[in-house]
C-alpha cells in the first residue's frame, strides 16, 4: 500500500474517528465551562471575596506602585500577574469537577445498562419443532 492509502486506512479506523470526535466535543465543552467560570462563578467568588477581581492582581517587580495592571504595563514594568494563576487554578478545579460529574454519570448509566436483566430466552427452534412433533403424535 502507498503512503496515502495507509494514512486513509488509519483515519478510517473507529479509534481515530472517536478520538477526533472527543477532541472537538472537548473543545466545545471547554468553551462552555470557561464561559460558566468567567461569567457566572468568578463574579460570585468576587462578591464573596469583597469584589476582588483576581485577574487584576499583580506585583510590579521594580518595587513601584501602580494604580492597575494596565498602568504598570504602560510604564514598562515587569509584573508577576499572580491573579491570572489563581484564575487558571479555579478554572482547572471547576472543569475537573464537571468532567468528573459527566464521567460518573456515564459510568452509572453503563452499570445500569449492564445490570438490566435480559429477558429469558424462549425455546429454541429445535425445541419448538420437537414439541410440535410430540403434539402431532398424540
Swiss-Prot record:
Top-level taxon of the source organism: Bacteria
Any Pfam family hit: MscL
Protein name stated in the entry: Large-conductance mechanosensitive channel
Source organism (scientific name): Flavobacterium psychrophilum (strain ATCC 49511 / DSM 21280 / CIP 103535 / JIP02/86)
GO terms of molecular function: mechanosensitive monoatomic ion channel activity
Function text: Channel that opens in response to stretch forces in the membrane lipid bilayer. May participate in the regulation of osmotic pressure changes within the cell.
Membrane topology: Multi-pass membrane protein
Gene3D superfamilies: Large-conductance mechanosensitive channel, MscL, domain 1
Family label: Belongs to the MscL family.
Keyword annotations of the record: Cell inner membrane, Cell membrane, Ion channel, Ion transport, Membrane, Transmembrane, Transmembrane helix, Transport
Subunit: Homopentamer.
Gene name for this UniProt entry: mscL
Amino acid at each position: 500500500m502507498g503512503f496515502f492509502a495507509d494514512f486513509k486506512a488509519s483515519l478510517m479506523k473507529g479509534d481515530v474517528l472517536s478520538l477526533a470526535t472527543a477532541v472537538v466535543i472537548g473543545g466545545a465543552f471547554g468553551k462552555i465551562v470557561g464561559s460558566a467560570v468567567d461569567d457566572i462563578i468568578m463574579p460570585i467568588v468576587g462578591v464573596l471575596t469583597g469584589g476582588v477581581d483576581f485577574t487584576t492582581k499583580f506585583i510590579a517587580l521594580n518595587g513601584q506602585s501602580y494604580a492597575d495592571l494596565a498602568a504598570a504595563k504602560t510604564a514598562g514594568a515587569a509584573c508577576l500577574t499572580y491573579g491570572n494563576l489563581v484564575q487558571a487554578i479555579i478554572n482547572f478545579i471547576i472543569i475537573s469537577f464537571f468532567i468528573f460529574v459527566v464521567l460518573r454519570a456515564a459510568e452509572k448509566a453503563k452499570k445500569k445498562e449492564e445490570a438490566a436483566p435480559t429477558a429469558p430466552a424462549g425455546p429454541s427452534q429445535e425445541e419448538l419443532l420437537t414439541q410440535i412433533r410430540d403434539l402431532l403424535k398424540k
